[in-house]
Amino acid sequence: MSSDAVQTRLLDAAEELFYGRGIQSVGMDDIRSASGLSLKRLYQLYPAKERLVEAYLERRDGRWRDRLATHVDTAGPDPLARLLAVFDWLELWFGEPDFRGCAWINSFGELGGVSATVARHAREHKDAFREYLRGLVRDAGRPDALAEHLYLLAEGAMVTAGIFASTAPARQALGAARALLA
């Protein structure tokens, strides 16, 4: 098996377990079992669990941002439609069968107080999302302050959807976003 295939298999297993069960409840032996790799190989690739957590958050961040941007691009050139498409995408994401909330909020809640690495990744992800929204708001010719309001709507929807396993918070946030844009 190629090095890339081993890495993919390992990160797939780690992501499924970390996101599904929480980081602290998953041991390296759980990841070994799920990935089918030896514990020796696992520790060769990631000598510490925190490094595997970091790789998981980095990979998930890239995929999350790509999926959001791809969906927003399907809204076409209209700046307001693109901005509102963020909330449409949140509803799609919240409706995924394995949705368990925001991986960065969950990770920060578990480890943000004891892991500077996890705290940094959570902040970087949230800052990137805020900046993405700010860009969409500017493209729509609206004031930067609106981006902060929309950001808080989206973040609140993420937390609520994760807790209640519902897509309704995305629709409610979309309604509030429309009111702010009116």
Q: What residues fall within each predicted segment?
A:
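Hydrophobic/aromatic-rich alpha-helical bundle segments in the mid-to-C-terminal region
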Residues: T117-D127, R138-L181
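Amphipathic alpha-helical packing segments from all-alpha helical-bundle domains
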Residues: G62-R65, A69, A81-L84, V114-D139, ...
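N-terminal intrinsically disordered/low-complexity leader segments
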Residues: M1-A5
